[in-house]
Amino acid sequence: MSQAPNRLKPFFENLEFEQNDGKMILNFGPQHPSAHGQLKLVLELDGEKVVRAMPEVGFMHRGVEKMAENMTYQEFIPVTDRVDYIASSANNYAFCAAVEKLCAIEVPRRAQIIRVMLLELNRISSHLLFLATHALDVGAMSVFLYAFREREYVLDLIEKYCGARLTHSSIRIGGVPLDLPDGWCEELLKFCEKFPSDITLYEDLLSANRIWQARLIDVGVVSKELALSSGCSGVMLRASGIARDIRKEEPYLIYDELEFDVPYATKGDCYARYLLYMKEMRECVKILKQCVSKYQTSSPAIIADAPEYVSASKEQIMSQNYSLMQHFVLITQGLKPPKGEIYFASESPKGELGIYINSDGSASPYRLKIRTPSFWHCAIYEDMLVGQYVADVAAIIGSTNIILGEVDR
């Protein structure tokens, strides 16, 4: 028998709650400032504690995967920017790398180095936004301002390369669209020299702060077993004691040539996740410094020599008839990978970002699936919020670092 909505026994579409004496139903979001977009949580409270949590998603659903089936592979690249719009280069790369794997395209070394630079700058930018918003959720306003100050330097570097600050479209199938501008590496090195002291400033303000520790330590604990069974990845997995990083486990680009550590913790609480984000930013700086030295000794090619799938350089298109015709065909008809299916996983700032492509040999994917880390980290709220105080819900959500563009797609 259908239930009529009333004030005593709330009714929620698609959700069923047994209203027991002394329990209260609380809607958290989707307009709440700590909801990280359009997240809605229906919480059942017993006093101050959460006894049941139900995430309700879909408010940002745009049908991205279905859009891919009606676009050419090149046309879909800007759409990937809008999945995790805080780390758009990571999405660009994962999609392009999946197509390259399907087509057996070999990317030039310099293009690989530039890609790593963009990915690690993107990682720093994403981590700084996490730190700023997480601190603001808990009440540390000054850290929010400091983190955004440094994030501006990162966005300026990315903007000088590709012209965009948020949705980059900075990676192409077969390589990258541009070489680094003059003086860009010098500016990057200046940032790398300064940024570790900025991280120290954040740590001085937060790590030993009694209020910060009281709000995060032993709050939102995710055990190793729960992290594995729930499909967690990235910092969410490493904070629970599993040091898995795809850049180390299944290296891509030039990551197997780079020296960097994979920080991990064992406690699995909000504080452990915060510490890992701080340590990861230091590792990003180490990677960027190594990339600059490797870039300076690399050959100038930035796009693959694969005429069947990739356009020639602009100079060749403007001077050679064959290159012009091949470019015209690729733009008007799109590249056509061989029939088959492929899955490619990369380590995005938030965890494992995977792209599955099923190709029927046409210029559009027969099926495309995006495996986003935020979707799985959002689903775990049903377990990790139970038993927590309602005042800690915002801090727990912030520590998982989800983006609703990834959750809903």
From Swiss-Prot:
Reaction catalyzed: a quinone + NADH + 5 H(+)(in) = a quinol + NAD(+) + 4 H(+)(out)
Gene3D superfamilies: Cytochrome-c3 Hydrogenase, chain B
Topology of this chain in the membrane: Peripheral membrane protein
InterPro entries xref list: NADH_Q_OxRdtase_suD (IPR001135), NDH1_su_D/H (IPR022885), NiFe-Hase_large (IPR029014)
A Gene Ontology cellular-component term: plasma membrane
Keywords on record: Cell inner membrane, Cell membrane, Membrane, NAD, Quinone, Translocase, Transport, Ubiquinone
SUPFAM superfamilies per record: HydB/Nqo4-like (SSF56762)
EC number, UniProt record: 7.1.1.-
Single GO MF annotation: quinone binding
Keyword rRNA-binding: no
Function: NDH-1 shuttles electrons from NADH, via FMN and iron-sulfur (Fe-S) centers, to quinones in the respiratory chain. The immediate electron acceptor for the enzyme in this species is believed to be ubiquinone. Couples the redox reaction to proton translocation (for every two electrons transferred, four hydrogen ions are translocated across the cytoplasmic membrane), and thus conserves the redox energy in a proton gradient.
Assembly: NDH-1 is composed of 14 different subunits. Subunits NuoB, C, D, E, F, and G constitute the peripheral sector of the complex.
PANTHER family (UniProt xref): NADH DEHYDROGENASE [UBIQUINONE] IRON-SULFUR PROTEIN 2, MITOCHONDRIAL, NADH-UBIQUINONE OXIDOREDUCTASE 49 KDA SUBUNIT
Family classification: Belongs to the complex I 49 kDa subunit family.
Name of protein: NADH-quinone oxidoreductase subunit D
Source organism of this protein record: Campylobacter concisus (strain 13826)
Gene name of the record: nuoD
